[in-house]
């Protein structure tokens, strides 16, 4: 869902 995509997006944006 959108929640999973959200955490994924933030994860990539953080560069982790």
From Swiss-Prot:
Matching Gene3D superfamilies: Endochitinase, domain 2
Keyword Hydrolase found: yes
InterPro entries referenced in this protein's UniProt entry, alphabetically: Lysozyme-like_dom_sf (IPR023346)
Record-listed E.C. numbers: 3.2.1.14
GO process terms (BP): chitin catabolic process; defense response; polysaccharide catabolic process
Top-rank taxon: Eukaryota
Keyword entries, A-Z: Carbohydrate metabolism, Chitin degradation, Glycosidase, Hydrolase, Plant defense, Polysaccharide degradation
Molecular functions (GO terms): endochitinase activity
Enzyme class label: hydrolase
Catalyses which reaction(s): Random endo-hydrolysis of N-acetyl-beta-D-glucosaminide (1->4)-beta-linkages in chitin and chitodextrins
Function of the protein: Defense against chitin-containing fungal pathogens.
Protein family: Belongs to the glycosyl hydrolase 19 family. Chitinase class I subfamily.
Name of this protein: Endochitinase 1
Organism: Ginkgo biloba (Ginkgo)
